[in-house]
Regions:
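Structural alpha/beta surface segment adjacent to cysteine/selenocysteine redox centers
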Residues: 23-127
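A short SAM/SAH-binding and catalytic strip from SAM-dependent methyltransferases
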Residues: 16-17, 70
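C-terminal cap of thioredoxin/glutaredoxin-like
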Residues: 3-10, 14, 20-37, 41, ...
């Protein structure tokens, strides 16, 4: 009998630790499935806005310096860049930072096609590796096309009002859960893991959860 581990990953698309966390989660899932052939995973992504009042197209580096302070940002940069590189991510801090709501809408939309994980990966790449604007509709539609979705359909969706109320509801639900930092993982609807945990740590968590189920 197959056992299922359901993971809801709460993320924001401009959070570097969410990108790092996704790579670690992917690796942990692959490793656990390889060692446990009777286990399958259902991974979905839920929205979180680190700053729901952010204006669009603010200078990315300047915004981080304003948030953390220039001295702290400069001290953090080598460490997080090195950590990201260890996960195969070429982290960059050029370009602009914008509100992430539309990127979350597109991720929500992609779920009906089974493309959420791939699209999250592609949107993170466009923002962190290519210095593109996460609120730019053309860039988001290109990301959708890159994972096998129809660009014109993605663009039509983003420019419409579809998914707005649904994503707002998901954001409210996460607020009710008292989630104040991401990434945050909800496992089998009753366990939670906070932060971009190492893959080995996540594998241990999966084992512990299955032993309780």
């Amino acid at each position: 009998m197959s056992r299922v581990i359901k993971i809801q990953a709460v993320i924001d698309t401009v959070c570097p630790w969410c990108f790092i966390g996704k790579r670690r989660l992917d690796r942990a899932v692959d490793a656990f499935k390889a060692a446990n052939s009777d286990v399958s995973f259902q991974v979905s992504y839920l929205p979180f806005e680190l700053d729901s009042q952010r204006e669009n197209q603010l200078n990315k580096e300047a915004s981080y310096k304003k948030k953390f302070g220039e001295e702290r940002f400069n001290a953090m940069l080598p460490s997080i860049t090195k950590t990201a590189a260890g996960e195969g991510i070429n982290l960059k801090f050029g370009g602009v930072i914008s509100r992430t709501f539309d990127s979350h809408r597109l991720i929500w939309w992609s779920n009906q096609y089974g493309k959420q994980a791939e699209l999250v990966e592609e949107i993170c790449k466009l923002y962190f590796e290519r210095n593109e604007d996460v609120a730019d509709h053309e860039a988001l539609a290109n990301a959708a096309e890159n994972v096998g979705l129809v660009k014109t359909q993605a663009l039509e969706f983003i420019k419409s009002d579809q998914g707005i109320s649904e994503v707002r509801d998901l954001l409210r639900q996460n607020a009710f859960r008292d989630i104040n930092g991401v990434p945050y993982y909800i496992i089998n609807d009753k366990y939670s893991v906070s932060g971009a945990q190492e893959s080995d740590t996540l594998v241990k968590v999966f084992s512990q959860i299955l032993s309780k189920e």
